[in-house]
Amino acid sequence: MVAANLEVPTSSSSSAATKRQKDVDNKLEKCLNDMLKLKTSSNNNSTSNSNNNAIMSHSLTGEHKDPKTALEGPTSSSSSSSSKYIGESQIPVPVQLYDPQKPLLQQQQQQQRICYPIGKSNSTSQLPMGGYQRLLQHQQQQHHQQQQQQHQEQQQYPQHKRPFLNWNSFACSAMNGASDPFMQQQHMPAHQQQQHLPHKLQQSYSSSHVPKQAPKSGLAMFLQKNTNKENKFGQPMQQQPPGMMPQMYGYQAPQQQSKIGYPRTGAPLTHSASFSSAQRPTALQFHQQHQQQQHLQQQQQHPQQQQHQHSSFGVGMMSRNYYNMPKQPERKPLQTFDPYAYPKPNQMQPVKYQQQQQHPHTQFQNASAGGGGGGAAGLQYDPNTNTQLFYASPASSSSNKQPQQPQQQQQQQQSQLQQSNSVIFNHSGQQHQPHQQQQNEMSKSALGLHFIETAKPVIQDDADGHLIYHTGDILHHRYKIMATLGEGTFGRVVKVKDMERDYCMALKIIKNVEKYREAAKLEINALEKIAQKDPHCDHLCVKMIDWFDYHGHMCIVFEMLGLSVFDFLRENNYEPYPLDQVRHMAYQLCYSVKFLHDNRLTHTDLKPENILFVDSDYTSHYNHKINREVRRVKNTDVRLIDFGSATFDHEHHSTIVSTRHYRAPEVILELGWSQPCDVWSIGCILFELYLGITLFQTHDNREHLAMMERILGQIPYRMARNHTLYSKTKTKYFYHGKLDWDEKSSAGRYVRDHCKPLFLCQLSDSEDHCELFSLIKKMLEYEPSSRITLGEALHHPFFDRLPPHHRVGEVSNKQPLSSGSSSRERSHSLSR
């Protein structure tokens, strides 16, 4: 279109106005003659030239003399070649086109926009014929092309930093059914694209020496212009050859919204994907300008050859689309993604890769033009939909820019899918998976991405080293967290659901602390040894199903059990267990720990919290003595858990083991320990199950020893002397063979008031109760060598009343009653 503007002469002299008018008429006649010559030499543009002649003849009749009628009169027909002469100082003005070959009513209905200069000038260069003079001057065309070339070269550099991209505005409109303006522009016919091309004001560049980045085409440009106020008036979108970009981006229908999915389960994304200014896409390295012009000419002359070359994914495609094919943005790991949001990828079916070998459209890769940390984007042919798909790969695998062989491409694609969990997008709305085809909902921010490279979830720990998780998180691509079961010094235990077996299990998540991680490895080793000796769990030790290292957190999967005997006791308001239930639980505990001792393994952390019911269902009944309801567990089958502190005889023995309330005296006095320390702990447990209270409720070593003497009698002199001679601790608890303890102090009065001899704690003088306390007294012997072994305990009269169906296994009389040699236990426990 040609810019025109006529002004009324302001001179007072009529002669000067007449002279100027004659000068204008001469120029118009000269221009008309030139246009007539151009008409005879041009055959392709006969129709447009005839219109121009009509317009010029109409202008010569004198309409240009009146400035009011000039704005409505002579104009030139709109064409794509003349649209490039629109200056920055021009604004579009709707006018009517005059065509003598068409009816007047039809011409009045057609409205077009013609840009006229802004401002006033007395020069005649702003007359309507100035546009035709520029068309005839070839030097001005070359000068204009050079300016465009310099303008594009200046835009190849990065832009200034801009505000944070807000994807929600576009995502919300997309989810409400708003179509993509980029897709609308690409699917329009060529003549409609020219008519609908927006005439926007050119953005004036600042005086800064930092150049701007090239305008982005497509969806990236749409998001940039709608989310950045600084670039609200950006450069207009440059046109692309029809049918080029839809094939490159895999679009088939602008009405159908794209869907994303995962290679395995198709779980939807759950977090927003927003990128800061440091993670913006970088510009693509373009070819030289003369090569670009050559390819553009080849496209116009040979459209069929262009389509064939585009299907081969050669270098020519990059040069032909240098201004509308920006480099794919670099995607960094999303720091807000949750662990369960990304299921474990599986290998693609070999049939799909065999189909890709048969097609020449195998791969097209672009190496990352920026620094490290970015990813490479490519195109992949889909034989089912006859479209091309984007795929993302990590930066480590995109260093090679040369085309690869089909077999190497298959291996690389499989490794990339396994390592980076790449998501392949089909913009037609269909996702191809080996086992299922499922369309998933997308997160709001993911709607604005052509492709996305999924990253490994970022694992966060709290100040104590516990793993931060939420209900519904999926660990190790298999175990879905359902609830938290308990917490300890080692970590937490959660209830998980095995997604493969559809079965609930218990998952022990160890703290991300070195000492607890090493202890977990020892526990796994002990559980594996136990599984070798007892594959069917006949000896009542918990069964380990699986284990794995989850980002520094050792995780062990166990069978799902019920409450611990301590938790059930606490929920029952510390109402003690009936004696028959205590007998059955004590028998199972002795039987299970004896199995460990027979295999030269010491548990070292026996307590009610580590004894779990297989099923903690209960019945309630009213107790008239205490005037309230009490619970009674239905099934007293138990399992032994927590082998984190289990120690083999040949392994290093820590100085302090066991929980305070169940710690044996040889451990407190640092005289060495072995299997008898477990027997002491079992004696304390039986007392607690029987009475519902802890036998030694203290947190101080000296007070603990004072309670022992108050309940069990004086500590032997030999142990006191050995403690004084061999103990490495600076604190000495004995003076001249006696415990250094002030009974008149507040702590001494507390021990005297709350502790009493063991046999005075019996609830009844019946034979059953006396047999239980007899067993407890033998388990609480000071001397480890004098302490009863678990083999002997299983033959204690207290277990004679146990029903046959409660006996796990008959203990043969021919087997040694002790769990190992008594001399070995005594020598090891008193090795100092």
From Swiss-Prot:
SMART domains: S_TKc (SM00220). Residues 40-53, 137-158, 183-203, 285-310, 347-365, 396-419 have a biased composition (Low complexity). Residues 1-86, 135-158, 179-215, 258-419, 809-832 are annotated as: Disordered. The keyword Ligase does not apply. Autophosphorylated on serine, threonine and tyrosine residues. Keywords: ATP-binding, Cytoplasm, Developmental protein, Kinase, Nucleotide-binding, Nucleus, Phosphoprotein, Sensory transduction, Serine/threonine-protein kinase, Transferase, Tyrosine-protein kinase, Vision. The active site is at 605 (proton acceptor). Residues 8-18, 271-282 have a biased composition (Polar residues). It catalyses: L-seryl-[protein] + ATP = O-phospho-L-seryl-[protein] + ADP + H(+); L-threonyl-[protein] + ATP = O-phospho-L-threonyl-[protein] + ADP + H(+); L-tyrosyl-[protein] + ATP = O-phospho-L-tyrosyl-[protein] + ADP + H(+). Residues 479-799 form the Protein kinase domain. Residues 20-32, 823-832 have a biased composition (Basic and acidic residues). Pfam families: Pkinase. ATP binds at residues 485-493, 508. Ubiquitous expression in embryos. Stage 17 embryos show elevated expression in CNS and brain. Ubiquitous expression in larval imaginal disks. Increased expression posterior to the eye-antennal disk morphogenetic furrow. Its EC number is 2.7.12.1. One of its GO terms (biological process) is negative regulation of male germ cell proliferation. Disulfide bonds: none annotated. It is found in: Cytoplasm. Interacts (via N-terminus) with x16 (via Arg/Ser-rich region). Interacts with eEF1gamma (via C-terminus); the interaction is probably direct, is transient and leads to phosphorylation of eEF1gamma by Doa. Belongs to the protein kinase superfamily. CMGC Ser/Thr protein kinase family. Lammer subfamily. PANTHER family: SERINE/THREONINE-PROTEIN KINASE DOA-RELATED, SERINE_THREONINE-PROTEIN KINASE DOA. Dual specificity kinase involved in the negative regulation of microtubule-based transport through phsophorylation of the microtuble-binding protein eEF1gamma. May function in the control of alternative splicing by phosphorylating serine/arginine-rich splicing factors, the SR proteins, including x16. Negative regulator of the copia retrotransposon element of the white (w) gene. In the eye, it is required for normal pigmentation, photoreceptor cell development and for organization of interommatidial bristles. Also essential for embryonic segmentation and differentiation of the nervous system. This is Serine/threonine-protein kinase Doa.
